[in-house]
Amino acid sequence: MKNGEIMKTGIKIAMMSLLTFSLVGCNDFLDTTPHDSISDKVVWNDIHTATLYLNGFYPYIDRYGQFGSAQFQGNLTEGLTETFKYGSYVPGNKAGDSNNYVFTPETMSSTGNLLDAWTGGYERIRRINEFLESMRKHSTFSAEENAKLEAQARFFRAFVYFQLAKRHGGVILYTDMNLQKNKDRSSASETWDLIASDLKYAASVLPVRWDAANKERVTRGAAWAMLARTMLYAERWQDAKDAADSVFKLQVYSLTDKYEDAFKGGNSESILEYNYLVTGPNHTFDNDYVPYGDMDNDGGKGCPTQEMVESYQSKDGKTVDWSKWHGETTELPPYDQLEPRFAATVLYHGAQWKGHTMTNSVGGTYGQYMDYRSDTYPKGRTTTGYYLRKYLDESHTDFSVIKVSTQTWVELRLAEIYLIRAEANYRLGASGAALEDVNAVRQRPGMNLPALSGLSGNDLFKAIRQERKIELAYEGHLYWDMRRWKLADKEYNGYRVHGLKITPHQGAFKFEYVDCDLQDRKFLAKTYVFPIPYDELANNSAIEQYDEWK
């Protein structure tokens, strides 16, 4: 999606249209009230009105993105990994909930799961199925117009089912309004089959590009890219590779020269994005993550960790020696040696930001350090010595005037497709092809890291892991990657994250390696699959809870 006022207006009108046309009883997924009314005749006799109805599905891109609330109640799932630390220890807010889940994962249950997508997901699927059924019954449009409407709707149905599948594996499948109160889950294979079918249909119908008035819509490239992503999760390696190949064959997208440009709206590698306006829709990402000094008593809810910083290679592709900073020293950390993606992702002590030099130190004026648990809430302060830079809007300088954020959310971009194909080729035994795609990402003109060569087996997998961690940092992938690789229970148990406590010292600064958790983190193997919500179990006699959650 690219900027377009027509689409923006359409989305907002569509939210009212949905209430009028399709959401009678929207709190009850099994509501089967007939909708053969005047509203159906109005919708399906006017393509503009039907399109507004369809536009109500586009905000799902926002809901499940890093600026939305449907993944983890507005938290970044990176807070469940070694790469990000939330600053509060009080459950019930964005910062504290994440810490609660990594320290006491037993908190997750069928009656309380902040990562749950079941109820909201099925509500959205019902809306899509109702749209499709209503279209088939009442549409007066041409076959081509109907096909384009159906392709977009089925794209979003696959998109929502993917959110369920990556949490639960096999789920209850509904493709029409023939709803059953008691229905069992389908298998994981059947669930992935439906997702693939919807996306392949979308790819077969959607245009490579829309006209200017519709340029924000999902395209053939978005359908192929989403298919590549979902088939990677399904471990259908050939299907993932083939879908990725189809994206490249379109010859529409190219990597941006500069890494930081890949997150701006309308850039050359953006395949699917969602745009915002001050007047709405908008988001609050800056309010949550800007550094101390940007706004009063807010921001800095979560920050990159020392573990993440040390994951970055040097500009010449080598591992940087951080041993001097695993104690106390007044020597400046080697930030200037790190590859370009570091400075585009992390606001470090000494970085330039909005005309200021960051001072992420105790008592700092632009950026300020606080010990974890020294206060209930960070209020803009960092507990790691770092702040997030990626996604923040450097032009947003006065929060007293504009309190909301409008930077674009890029859901799918070409670098991810390179890395999907790299992993698929690795799984298929094509090590050389996998390395070519990893190197394509590493060697974009503005970065130009040395090419990797001669890697195979586990060494190649480590390189792919490294690139996904760095290239896709804070884009919502790492936690889910570690789950699908079944590595979370091995690497995310009995560990703590760290930071650098920076203190003014004799006209300079002292850097002290500190424990930012003060207790071990845990990952329970049973959380590889999330529990079915209690309400579903209570109202559906055909479904059983997973053995791990009984």
Where do the PLM segments sit?
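Bacterial Sec-dependent N-terminal signal peptides
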Residues: 3, 22-46, 195, 228, ...
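An aromatic- and glycine-enriched ligand-binding surface/loop that stacks and positions planar moieties
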Residues: 27-94, 200-201, 217-371, 492-495
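Conserved, well-structured interaction surfaces
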Residues: 46-55, 59-65, 90-168, 182-190, ...
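Flexible, polar/acidic helix-loop-strand segments at domain edges
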Residues: 95, 99-105, 329-413
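Long, intrinsically disordered, low-complexity segments
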Residues: 121-124, 194, 260-320, 326, ...
